[in-house]
Amino acid sequence: MALVRGAEPAAGPSRWLPTHVQVTVLRARGLRGKSSGAGSTSDAYTVIQVGREKYSTSVVEKTHGCPEWREECSFELPPGALDGLLRAQEADAGPAPWAASSAAACELVLTTMHRSLIGVDKFLGQATVALDEVFGAGRAQHTQWYKLHSKPGKKEKERGEIEVTIQFTRNNLSASMFDLSMKDKPRSPFSKIRDKMKGKKKYDLESASAILPSSAIEDPDLGSLGKMGKAKGFFLRNKLRKSSLTQSNTSLGSDSTLSSASGSLAYQGPGAELLTRSPSRSSWLSTEGGRDSAQSPKLFTHKRTYSDEANQMRVAPPRALLDLQGHLDAASRSSLCVNGSHIYNEEPQGPVRHRSSISGSLPSSGSLQAVSSRFSEEGPRSTDDTWPRGSRSNSSSEAVLGQEELSAQAKVLAPGASHPGEEEGARLPEGKPVQVATPIVASSEAVAEKEGARKEERKPRMGLFHHHHQGLSRSELGRRSSLGEKGGPILGASPHHSSSGEEKAKSSWFGLREAKDPTQKPSPHPVKPLSAAPVEGSPDRKQSRSSLSIALSSGLEKLKTVTSGSIQPVTQAPQAGQMVDTKRLKDSAVLDQSAKYYHLTHDELISLLLQRERELSQRDEHVQELESYIDRLLVRIMETSPTLLQIPPGPPK
Amino acid sequence: MGNGTEEDYNFVFKVVLIGESGVGKTNLLSRFTRNEFSHDSRTTIGVEFSTRTVMLGTAAVKAQIWDTAGLERYRAITSAYYRGAVGALLVFDLTKHQTYAVVERWLKELYDHAEATIVVMLVGNKSDLSQAREVPTEEARMFAENNGLLFLETSALDSTNVELAFETVLKEIFAKVSKQRQNSIRTNAITLGSAQAGQEPGPGEKRACC
């Protein structure tokens, strides 16, 4: 304490102000059983809320009233709470008459719920902790059991208690490691852009519009717009439930919005209109997206801030794209590709233009190109669709990544290197070869070329998902997946996110799903850049998809590198033409490995971890089966011809 | 005690190596049968054996030493592994007390599956790591005496007592066999293939059923 106080003379000794509060939900006991069926178990999770921020623990299944979570989250203390804490502190020194009034502003609300597979989750109990009181008791870590109560106004009954550790912290220490790292590297470079962007940002509107387009885009690619509505709706629900998804979505949305705002403000308006106008699908999406965006910020502050940064970074590329359109920004080009696709989609320009711009500037645009063509065909819808297309392609690629991370990376790299000629050719016809210069773009283009193949592939995939989405056509499924993955395309890291997001969306009903779906499993994990890239040059659709996502990520990476050379030393090495790009891609892929986790929320990380654990346990089981099989074989050998087991007299070493 | 040729032996004694994972069973085996030591710390998978023929007096005794992973879990091979064994080296790592603490469990498993007359030696391996010793020699020796076990401390790394340990066990087995068989020193071979299935209990009592 003394040191801290000394460090902050201005605040005075009693003025140590925590900026965050870290809440660790350890466990509960004496919970009521809610599951029908065996015993009185419950699938318990706890929602942790401070102010408008909420986190949720994972679900401990079939607990007999005493789940153990040991999950922590950190809340930025709302301004009101801060005052309360301050007063509480002052109260320590002397009486503070106004302390009580502000107390309500900083309550920690712990709501333990039972996850119902069907219907609404059931309330198990709620505990409210006055943070100022806790803080008043000292800055040390407080671990305490809190009694769970019934909902206010309802009959009180024995609901058990919950053990929580509360720790007040200052600055961003409580934030994730990534935050810190981000500050050092990517942030600084992009901060400027960010600021600029922010000036133009219109968060709510933009994010909403952005979200909508992405979802819509997917459909156009597939060609079944009508289906889109369903798919979107599906995803949206999922999103609503899973905050993490919403986050990624929002981030995307914000990016797109940013880009759109900066690049084509005029377009946004129309685009939004179009979306709303367009049949239920678009409207759905728009509304949903709006919700998500609105919600997401509240839910995860830290991460959100972090994600914001990412978004900003992402945003930067779009901006760059815009610039590129007008003027070529060497630095921004690469970045442009990633966001660029979105941007372009958003832009109100005629469909034809979109194509060219997309193909030229945006890596992700590969898919976009195809989209753009459709765009023109579709006419008015095209505007709406374009977004979805871009997103869709990205998402699909992401999904692919999930399944084949390694291959995807490899493929991505491969396309960049192998198809340069093709890409160029494609570009030329499109008429916007100039901006295409970035390798990422080329890869994306290659991807676009392969889109036809992809579509075919998608169908099979969709088949995988069919379980989840009954009755939906394959294309719809694909769209859905793309929707879920919207976030992916923007950032290198984001693709992973998005993929995970997808999984979650699919599995959102129950966290379990993720683990079960083989296809989904891989997606959460970041792309494995090194190993896969060189090995697999096959022109699989999956690869192409992955390449798209990779390209996106790489584009982001490039942006980072461009803006801040410090981030990726490897990329710095100057190489000519596409070679450079491919290398960058690889590097970016490496970076992506960690980057993928940047944007993951606490919940997402936990679910990822749980998924891994499930996979591991499955693997263990498999190993055990193999072992027992080997043992049985050994027994047979030992009983019939044991000499086979004799260690062959090898040459003396 | 010279090495006899592979074909020229009067007895085959099956000896099993047991003990916790990582105590050095495999290296004891390779040291004794091939005079090799591997710093590769991979755990043993599966089951294998190695042989070495030693002369005990006038008799050539082929030691068939079996080695497997020192896993706690039950394995289907357990009973087959112990079947027909007339000697056992129960190995622990004298630098890891935990491996000594579970010796009793291994003894139980041994007696559950092997003949009661099996010759058992408690082996404290890794005596070269004296500075890291966690199991006092006397403690282990006392335990061995109380349980009717032979006892030695060995080092597969520097070969200390490795030969002695195996030969002591083989001698003990041989003595038991000789005692039981009295004057019959003809080729009593505990051959793996044929003898194993129909082996009778008791060390050295098994004749090759040629």
UniProtKB/Swiss-Prot annotation, chain A:
Phosphoserine carried by residues: S176, S283, S286, S307, S357, S367, S391, S395, S494, S538, S547, S553
C2 domain: residues covered: 5-146
Quaternary structure (record): Interacts with RAB11FIP4. Interacts with NAPG. Interacts with RO60. Interacts with RAB11A that has been activated by GTP binding.
Biased composition (Low complexity): 357-368
Pfam families reported for this sequence: C2 (PF00168), RBD-FIP (PF09457)
Keyword Mitochondrion: yes
Tissue specificity note: Detected at low levels in heart, brain, placenta, lung, liver, adipocytes, kidney, spleen, skeletal muscle and pancreas.
Membrane topology: Peripheral membrane protein
Name of the molecule in the record: Rab11 family-interacting protein 5
Disulfide bonds: none
Role played: Rab effector involved in protein trafficking from apical recycling endosomes to the apical plasma membrane. Involved in insulin granule exocytosis. May regulate V-ATPase intracellular transport in response to extracellular acidosis.
InterPro entries in alphabetical order: C2_dom, C2_domain_sf, FIP-RBD_C_sf, FIP_classI, Rab-bd_FIP-RBD
Comment field on protein domains: Binds to vesicles enriched in neutral phospholipids via its C2 domain. The interaction is favored by Mg(2+) rather than Ca(2+).
Main location: cytoplasm
GO molecular function terms attached to this record: gamma-tubulin binding; small GTPase binding
Gene expressing this chain: RAB11FIP5
PANTHER family found in the cross-reference section: RAB11 FAMILY-INTERACTING PROTEIN 5 (PTHR15746:SF14), RAB11-RELATED (PTHR15746)
Post-translational modification remark: Phosphorylated on serine and threonine residues. Phosphorylation at Ser-357 is PKA-dependent.
Sequence ranges assigned to domain FIP-RBD in this UniProt record: 586-648
Keywords, sorted A to Z: Cytoplasm, Cytoplasmic vesicle, Endosome, Golgi apparatus, Host-virus interaction, Membrane, Mitochondrion, Phosphoprotein, Protein transport, Transport
Localization in the cell: Cytoplasm; Recycling endosome membrane; Early endosome membrane; Golgi apparatus membrane
Biased composition (Basic and acidic residues): 375-387, 420-430, 447-460
Presence of keyword Phosphoprotein: yes
Renumbered residue ranges of the record's region Disordered: 269-300, 342-402, 415-548
GO BP, one annotated term: regulated exocytosis
A Gene Ontology cellular-component term: plasma membrane
Polar residues compositional bias, start-end: 277-286
